[in-house]
Amino acid sequence: MKANALNRCFNCLLLALGTSVLLAAPTAGMAQTMPHQSPHQSVGTVNCASSTCHGSIAERTATPVLQNEYTTWLREDPHTQAYAVLKNAQSQRIAKNMGLAQPAHEAKVCLDCHSHNVPASKQGPRFDKSDGVNCEACHGPAEKWIKTHVEPKASNTKNIENGLYPTSDPYAAAKLCTSCHVGDSSRPITHQIMGAGHPRISIEVETFMALEPPHYRIDEDWVKRKGAYDAGKIWAMGQFASSANLLELIADTKRNRQGIMPELMMFDCHACHSPMSKKDWSKDLARSPGQARINNSSLIMVQAIIRAAAPQHSSDIGKLVNQLHIASTSPAANFNEVERAANVLHAQLNTVRKVVATVPFTEQVLEKILKDLVNMAANNQYADFAGAEQAYMSISSVANGLARKGNSRIAQTVNSKMDRLLKLLSNDEAYDREAFQSELLALKAAVGA
């Protein structure tokens, strides 16, 4: 597959450095019902579109919110096209290849992530699935809060009690994004889907939110309503969420009992989908030649976060990650051992995440993470394209976080190198591990890592 849409958008992101999304610091990431699983009715995006609500053409300055949120979503957010894309030739071909009884724009497996796919009994009279990934797909069915959220005494806490999804909580937001961009038990993304022709899927939550683009502004009023924010937390919680979803899917017995092979979607795509003529296996890799490896790109990032923000847990997490890889690549590997290793790591990461959520991502913490991400090139951690792609987005996000903290020197040094790194990621099939790592090693000296 040639450069995907994300790669093509990276240049746009580089021009907007310093404007990425900032979300409120989480409490402990309390469990929250996903919008598509809510018991409440979805009333339809049209109810948000009035110019006196969120459909203003221009931003309003005299109100607590911009009031042009719907307009920004409609004009600029790719999520508006999520349903429409199901009608194009590629989507219809995927549905045919999968042997679906319905066309893509009617099949549940497609609609689950390409629309706000709720049961008919939960659809209000003005609900329209063709709106794609609409307001209620992210903010939750509005049946109980659409009237009360504009009342003078309304509060964010009360709105959440009424069914508003807490997108201002970094981990809750990240779990929502990754439920489709990684997959979860309710919306699994399988190797069958990919094999039928679906483009490769990847995500780094903070980067994707910056590209979305944001339809709100973090200002004094926002903070007053939703609480203080921490610039680096959305990136960190995004990595924890991606890792959690991956581990949950690995441990899902319903997904790993379909023949002699496990669900291949959890593995690094390029371990198999690499040209036969490409002979770049390195003895430094933590696997033998010919072995498929679980896609650990987010786990690599999480370990860097833990080393900086919760170092007391670093050794234990590192051992558990290694145990997962050993279980999945052992000649005597079996599903039960892999699932056990995934469950143990998942439980421990959930505990550590709650610790990390309480740690302020200061300039010192972010700088330590950045240098660690750069240093990992020397240890061959970015041997696979997925790891390199995640490193690129993460280094950019953390550098932007440093800029917001006032450390413009390191941020400018990093940003001056990003174009060259991006070029090395423009074609996943032609990824040059040594060239990418060489660029990062040059950056290592520049930032004093």
Model-based region annotation:
Residues 1-10:
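N-terminal secretory signal peptides that target proteins for export/translocation
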Residues 12-25:
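Bacterial N-terminal signal peptides
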Residues 27-31:
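Sec/Tat signal peptide C-region and signal peptidase I cleavage site
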Residues 33-36, 57-96, 125-133, 141-388:
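Primarily the internal scaffold of c-type cytochrome electron-transfer domains
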Residues 41-50, 103, 107, 132, ...:
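Residues immediately within or flanking Cys/His clusters that coordinate Zn2+
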Residues 46-54, 111, 136, 178, ...:
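Cys/His/Pro-rich metal-binding microdomains
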Residues 96-136, 387, 402:
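Post-signal peptide N-terminal segment of secreted/secretory-pathway proteins
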Residues 375-449:
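A cross-kingdom marker for long, charged
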